A protein has these predicted regions:
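Active-site cavity-forming subdomains of large catalytic enzyme subunits
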Residues: 1-2
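Active-site loops and adjacent core secondary-structure elements that bind or stabilize anionic groups
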Residues: 7-199
Length: 199
């Protein structure tokens, strides 16, 4: 069974050369079962959500590969980023990368940590700095620029090369402050055009 149009050319080529190889058959079979298992797991997850059963006797989770990472926890390791198809609002997996190089495992881990801390600030303009899975600065202010300055001042050494996240739109003033040092990732719900030109 061929369930992915991306595999058609490979299967046709092998058929034209005498038959589909054993290796390809196992590859295709695995792909079919991955998809049917994922489908069943999604239905189970949906129904569990309706019934409110948070702790079922058996739990099957399914994730879709979002991207291959630049590298794993260390440069010699491989990694991939998977997302839950039944994503929650504000999940990192739904973020759009606007520019920059491919992300690494550490980038994803730090970005997720920054968002976890940021969720604690629902009614305040906040900025969180994270590096190597540790918060290195948190600031609250009237503006993103003010909150960023407080987060930066908490530890101006550690925040260099780290991840910064805010829960408000980044404007030109905030972008100019952030652009003064190297930051791996800057996360925000939105950016003004002027801010994007600086970053």
């Amino acid at each position: 069974v061929v369930i992915d149009a991306a595999d058609y050319a490979k299967v046709l080529e092998e058929l034209n050369n005498g038959g589909v190889t054993r290796e390809t058959k196992f590859y295709l079979a695995a792909k079919v079962f991955e998809n049917t298992a994922a489908y069943d797991a999604l239905i189970s997850s949906y129904l569990r959500g309706i019934t409110g059963n948070a702790f079922p006797d058996k739990l099957t989770l399914t994730y879709e590969k979002a991207q291959t990472m630049r590298y794993g926890e260390n440069p010699h390791q491989n990694a991939a980023f998977y997302k839950n198809p039944l994503m929650t609002p504000g999940a990192l997996s739904e973020a759009e990368q606007l520019n920059g190089k491919e992300l690494s495992y550490n980038n994803i881990n730090d970005a997720n940590g920054a968002l976890d801390v940021l969720r604690e600030f629902k009614d305040e303009v906040a900025v969180v700095g994270v590096k190597h899975a540790n918060p290195c600065g948190v600031g609250v202010g009237a503006t993103v620029a003010e909150a960023y300055q407080k987060a930066y001042d908490a530890d101006p050494i550690s925040i260099f090369g780290g991840i910064v996240a805010t829960n408000e739109t980044i404007d030109l003033e905030a972008a100019e402050k952030m652009a003064q040092i190297f930051l791996e990732i800057i996360i925000a719900p939105d950016y003004t055009e002027e801010a994007l030109a600086v970053l």
